[in-house]
């Protein structure tokens, strides 16, 4: 079980910088984001949606939308990355990740709005994910993608992931990376708050 306290989701928000210097706000998705999230997925190109879900969909089915917004359920989390566009907070990327405690691993999937490709948003999200995964006491992160998804494969390779054959589907490839974030750096809110929570729950804290 994770040490995250999810009563106030906004405390786990992070402010990142893209490769081009833009401010990227990363926060957990909330029920109030239902329409925004659906609009985001509808605005993706057909290819981007296919690459994200390994199938043809035009929007999130009702059940999957519920899962995306039910942050923390079964140790699954969804974050949205937003930027100010024409004066409005706009979702430009999303990432969903799940903790597999039995293997100390976090599995993830992500997408970036086609109009914002090339800004380094996915790279920033992956770096942030390492910290979020470490807060869950994971030791490595992994993802899967279609062998035809050259963009994701290139991103994973540049981000230091090792590639292995998928155990169940020849059309997919799996990539895995050992988490190399130093605890002393505390580069994200999730890690800092998890550390404080463990400290407060330790026997020495109440002695």
Q: Predicted regions span which residues?
A:
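Long, contiguous binding/interaction regions
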Residues: 1-207
């Amino acid at each position: 079980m994770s040490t995250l306290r999810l009563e106030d989701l906004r405390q786990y928000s992070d402010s990142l910088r893209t490769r081009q210097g833009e401010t990227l706000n990363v926060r957990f998705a909330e029920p109030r984001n239902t329409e925004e999230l659906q609009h985001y997925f509808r605005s993706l190109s057909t290819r981007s949606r296919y690459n994200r879900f390994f199938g043809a969909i035009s929007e999130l089915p009702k059940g999957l939308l519920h899962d995306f917004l039910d942050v923390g359920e079964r140790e699954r989390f969804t974050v949205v990355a937003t930027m100010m566009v024409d004066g409005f907070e706009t979702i430009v990327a999303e990432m969903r990740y799940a903790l597999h405690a039995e293997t100390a691993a976090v599995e993830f999937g992500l997408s970036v709005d086609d109009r914002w490709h090339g800004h380094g948003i996915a790279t920033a999200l992956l770096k942030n994910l390492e910290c979020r995964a470490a807060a869950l006491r994971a030791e490595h992160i992994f993802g899967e993608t279609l062998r035809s998804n050259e963009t994701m494969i290139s991103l994973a390779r540049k981000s230091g992931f090792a590639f292995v054959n998928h155990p169940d589907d020849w059309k997919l490839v799996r990539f895995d990376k050992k988490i190399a974030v130093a605890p002393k750096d505390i580069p994200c809110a999730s890690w800092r708050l998890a550390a404080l929570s463990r400290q407060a729950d330790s026997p020495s804290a109440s002695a």
